[in-house]
From Swiss-Prot:
CDD domains: RPS2 (cd01425). Signal peptide: none annotated. Keywords: Chloroplast, Plastid, Ribonucleoprotein, Ribosomal protein. Its main location: plastid. This is Small ribosomal subunit protein uS2c. Belongs to the universal ribosomal protein uS2 family.
Length: 236
């Protein structure tokens, strides 16, 4: 895999607050190599490590995108939800930003069945078929459609398991991460000082609470994916 330059600067990371970890009482000792110091009761993340692993992650997603691989971005906490949706849409990736339904990947047959139902209901709504039903039946199906849109809207075009999963908050998305580990799907994980860096294939140490920090990491990854897609189209 060729190493590329992704213009990751310390200035922009500092400005986004990427270096601010959790309080020193709330930490995982496995994160020690990724912490540079303690300041006012807070662990400060080593941005040299952040730049290194973010660059590695960008190389990985560029390479995967240039070969037509499929991505899933997961981030369901309130602060990350909109950022995840916007990033995924920009990069033409699938995403989950509301709630991770247990077994979404490990029980793919059930997920596929739900997606099929979702697509059928969307088609019926667009063609006006739902409005031709008795009011009670139409109301039930519209509620079902709304529920499916909320939880599966970001993966409605997914036809198989993703090749790489990007996870915004390891603690919040632990179930999703475990499913990826079970299935052997490579993961890129944004990890704060209370996380376990050994669980993901590439762990990017960074503040997972600040919107600016999450946005910066996602923007770098999305740019790399978009560049990879462009390379794939040129060579197709």
């Amino acid at each position: 895999m060729t190493k590329r330059y992704w213009n990751i600067t310390f200035e922009e990371m500092m400005e986004a607050g990427v270096h601010f970890g959790h309080g020193t009482r709330k930490w995982n000792p496995k994160m020690a190599p990724y912490i540079s110091m303690k300041r006012k009761g807070i662990h400060i993340i080593n941005l040299t490590r952040t730049a290194r692993f973010l660059s590695e992650a960008c190389d990985l997603v560029f390479d995967a995108a240039s070969r037509g691989k499929r991505f899933l971005i997961v981030g369901t906490k309130k602060k990350a939800a909109d950022l995840v949706a916007r990033a995924a849409i920009r990069a033409r990736c699938h995403y989950v930003n509301k709630k991770w339904l247990g077994g979404m990947l490990t029980n793919w047959y059930t997920t596929e069945t739900r997606l099929r139902k979702f697509r059928e209901l969307r088609t019926e709504q667009k063609t006006g078929k739902l409005n031709c039903l008795p009011k009670r039946d139409a109301a039930i199906l519209k509620r079902q459609l709304s529920h499916l849109e909320t939880y599966l809207g970001g993966i409605k075009y997914m036809t198989g398991l993703p090749d790489i999963v990007i996870i915004v908050d390891q603690q919040e998305e632990y179930t999703a991460l475990r499913e990826c580990i079970t299935l052997g799907i490579p993961t890129i994980c944004l990890i704060d000082t209370n996380c376990d860096p050994d669980l993901a294939d590439i762990s990017i140490p960074a503040n997972d609470d600040a919107i600016a920090s999450i946005r910066l990491i996602l923007n770098k990854l999305v740019f790399a994916i978009c560049e990879g897609h462009s390379s794939y189209i040129r060579n197709f």
